[in-house]
């Protein structure tokens, strides 16, 4: 690899909109994210499941099917 052409990789603090902070590596000075593992619904277990039954009923009602 050539010397002096690559950006400096350093430790940075990643800040989430929820207030959580953690350390990671990046070539940027600071990282801000909107969602992290502390507030993402997949990791918190507060997922919202859309039931397909409601959509099927709506389709059947719209087109007169049983």
From Swiss-Prot:
GO terms for biological process: translation. Pfam families: Ribosomal_L31 (PF01197). GO terms for molecular function: metal ion binding; rRNA binding; structural constituent of ribosome. Keywords: Metal-binding, Ribonucleoprotein, Ribosomal protein, RNA-binding, rRNA-binding, Zinc. One of its GO terms (cellular component) is ribosome. InterPro entries: Ribosomal_bL28/bL31-like_sf, Ribosomal_bL31, Ribosomal_bL31_A, Ribosomal_bL31_sf. Its cofactor is Zn(2+). Coiled coil: none annotated. Zn(2+) binds at residues 16, 18, 36, 39. Binds 1 zinc ion per subunit. Binds the 23S rRNA. Part of the 50S ribosomal subunit. HAMAP family: Ribosomal_bL31_1 (MF_00501). NCBIfam families: L31, PRK00019.1, PRK00528.1. Belongs to the bacterial ribosomal protein bL31 family. Type A subfamily. This is Large ribosomal subunit protein bL31. It comes from Geobacillus kaustophilus (strain HTA426). The gene is rpmE.
């Amino acid at each position: 690899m050539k010397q002096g052409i690559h950006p400096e990789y350093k430790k940075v603090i990643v800040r989430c909109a929820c207030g959580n902070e953690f350390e990671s590596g990046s070539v940027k000075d600071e990282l801000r994210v909107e969602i992290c593992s502390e507030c993402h619904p997949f990791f918190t277990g507060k997922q919202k499941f859309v039931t397909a039954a409601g959509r099927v009923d709506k389709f059947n009602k719209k087109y007169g099917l049983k």
